[in-house]
């Protein structure tokens, strides 16, 4: 629900929030669809001015970009089939099972640490890790039994469960509590200051929480 295509149009929480922020300037934001793996190089190449796509705070990213204050929770959780809820109660229970992740996502980056944790607890890690170009493909694989768990942000998976009641269950927490911010080039301090100011105003007015209720439930 952060950013996705609906009938070819880019929509979502990020889109609505960006529109609210830009309304104070009397302009409409332009959205450029970009491969996640190359999004930071594209930012510095000047293809766009900010990255607004549920980007979580990570050490390696903080070295490359400047972040706004948080605008959403970005902690990871794991989606499983509802029928497996009594058998998979933590990530460690995915020992000997198949994990699904999106290419270049925080979930993929967490895989080595999770594998190490599972091996330490159970003696055996994942039987396989399948990597998908997008999360909907991973959810479909979960429904079909190709994978046993899919990693994504907690707010996003909450929306997935809301849309298909009774089909899925959640395993959380996975890793540490984390937050998403809007990223800009390090030298663009004026943009970062503006983003922080707008986000603070929208938090104070409650508008940002109304958007979260709309998209995340």
Locations of the language-model features?
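Periplasmic-binding protein-like
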Residues: 73-80, 107-110, 154, 158-215, 217
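Flexible hinge/capping segments at coil-to-helix
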Residues: 82-99
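Short helix-initiation/N-cap motifs at beta->coil->alpha
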Residues: 30-41, 86, 124-140, 176-178
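Beta->alpha turn/N-cap motifs
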Residues: 32-37, 46-58, 74, 81-82, ...
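Ligand-binding cleft/hinge of the Venus flytrap
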Residues: 3-5, 18-27, 107-131, 161-165
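A ligand-binding cleft/hinge motif common to bilobed small-molecule-binding domains
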Residues: 38, 55-63, 110-117, 136, ...
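Extracytoplasmic small-molecule ligand-binding "clamshell" domains
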Residues: 1-54, 194
